[in-house]
Amino acid sequence: MLEMNSGMFLQGRPAMGSWVTYGLGSENQNLPGFVVLHGSMPRGGKPIWAPGFLPKKFQPTAINGTNPIGNLTRRKSMDDQHQRAQLDILRAMNRVHGEPRSLERDLAARIESFELAYRMQTAAPEAMDVNQESKATQQAYGVDQKETQLVGRQCIMARRLIERGVRFVQLYAGTNGGGGGVADVPWDGHNDIGANHRIAAKSVDQPIGALLSDLKSRGMLEDTLVVWGGEFGRTSDAQSGKGRDHNPNAFTMWMAGGGIKGGAHYGASDEFGYKAVENRVSVNDLHATILHLLGIDHERLTYFFNGRDFRLTDVAGKVINEILCLLYTSDLPTNCVV
């Protein structure tokens, strides 16, 4: 999971969402530029989407799909005027505290987070309120069904956030099943891949289909890149009877909208589905292609740290031009749902 997000399998490198917001900034100053939507906490926890050595203002706001944002509502005894006065006093104190500590980036980011939280009190609840959608829309996403409710809500939230200028939204579904119930069953089919994948696939199939249709009907799909995938595939040989083991040597991801050529496919595995043998794509290639579609040259998006320039694709990565509608030079999509 770390490698799919940051290009490296070790902690400490920035996640792709942080790189994108570092490169493109945010379109809505009242909402975060990078949002993570999850049910159960994915294996690896928060480090998999951390900003690494990038300034902490590029870290995501992580939101539980069943309990969106905690501690966002101010106390009933405090009105907007009094809260603004309180924050102004806090800002003045922080300024005095921060002047001799101007090189402490984490401190500056922490101070900035208070202001963002204040602005989010108005913008975030409205953006996250799935109940503002029509009954027909909620049913299309599967919000009314137990199996699809969690991912359906996440997909609606993602569309609403993108609609309001959030630059990068990342959804996690079927991560570990730790208390998530049927709606968050993991894709880890070691014992019975048939039963496991039927449930896991059902939880995402209707919601993601509805998201694509919804984005297209609203004229948003051409400006929004949607990326769907995991971190590895499964072996073709049996494990524990009906199960399948992990297989990082060959697996599938798909992309839609945002300059992707519909119906195109790239790469192939051997006859056993065990190993990629034709037009192999690395994680660096995937990241280079995503950044290209968002208008970013992956070789020029760099950050100086520990004596050298770092980038998401490190020293590798090539754009997969064969899956693009055209070789973009301008008028690029600027939002991403992963």
Q: For the regions a protein language model found, what residue spans apply to each?
A:
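Ligand-binding pockets and gating/stacking loops
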Residues: M1-L327
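Conserved small/polar residues in nucleotide/adenosyl-binding loops
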Residues: Y328-T334
